[in-house]
Structures are given as C-alpha cells and as structure tokens.
Amino acid sequence: ILKCKDPKKTCMTILTDKEETGSDGNTGLNSSYLPYFIADLAKVYGLEGRNVISASECLSADVNAAYDPTFSEPFEIRNSSQINYGVVATKFTGARGKSGTSDASAEFVGRVRKLFDEHNIVWQTGELGKVDGGGGGTVAQYIANLDMNVIDVGVPVLSMHAPFEI
C-alpha cells in the first residue's frame, strides 16, 4: 500500500491488537474503533460512514494452518493449504456448524481470484483444519459484521502457535 501512487479509490491499512485473545479492548478489532474511524474519515468527504463501510472490501491479513504430514489428524488434506504453494485465501472460518463464522460471498472471492491472477500472485485456498476440529478463529467475522466484504489472505504456517513455526 505504501507504493500505491494516486489510487482511484481510498486505500488504507488498519493495524489492531488482541486477535489471539478475542479482539476485545480499545485496540482490538471487536471494538468500535474501525467504524468510528471510517465514519470520521467519511464525514470529511460529506459521506455517511455506514455507506462507506458497506461499499468497502477487505483483505484480512491472517495466516492459515498448513497441512502437517507429521500431525495430520486435525487436517482435511484436500482442503488444506500447503507450504510453498502461495498465499492462502480462506473463504470461510468458524466452528460448531456456523458459529463465530465469516463466509466470503462467491462474487467477492471471484474478484479476489481475478486480482491475484491479473497480478501473477501465486495463491491457493485452504481451511483452518477439519470442521469442528478446534482453532480457526480470525478477525474476519468482526469485519463482516460491519457489512463489509472480507476474506482472509495470508501465508500458510506449519505448526501454528507451537514453539517452532515454519
């Protein structure tokens, strides 16, 4: 985003904290910070914050758990990301059926895929382990709850949260 010269649309990076502990507090994405910030920004241009949020799209930069052949039980191999096969687009997250979930629309996923392909970005899809196998939380659900299109995009990580990650 730093190299983006004279963009046609507003571009921004939002950095937040507390993702691993529920995204609560005034620095977490589950706070009112993001909608208030966008509302203040929109007001400068004579726009309504809620309309700006609804028209926005977000790539949530979060890692994905790569398939681990030495600890394969939590993974569904055909739906897992692999190390060295590009960034991972994670269409949906959540557990217990559809609890705590975010699910990017097919249209938004299509636009992201097209963007990757047009810019020769190597990418893959993957889920965060077997459904209801535990883990798999991201901040995408908080962004989606604002009525914003969002998808998780990040690198696959082997042995996530272990003392030694790859």
Q: Which sequence ranges carry the predicted segments?
A:
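Predominant activation on well-ordered alpha-helical scaffold segments within soluble catalytic domains
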Residues: 1-2, 35-39, 109-113, 140
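His/Asp/Glu-rich mid-to-C-terminal helical/loop segments that flank catalytic regions of hydrolases
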Residues: 2-12, 155-166
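Acidic/histidine-rich catalytic neighborhood of metal-dependent amide-processing enzymes
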Residues: 2-88, 134-135
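Active-site-adjacent substrate-binding region
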Residues: 66-71, 75-162
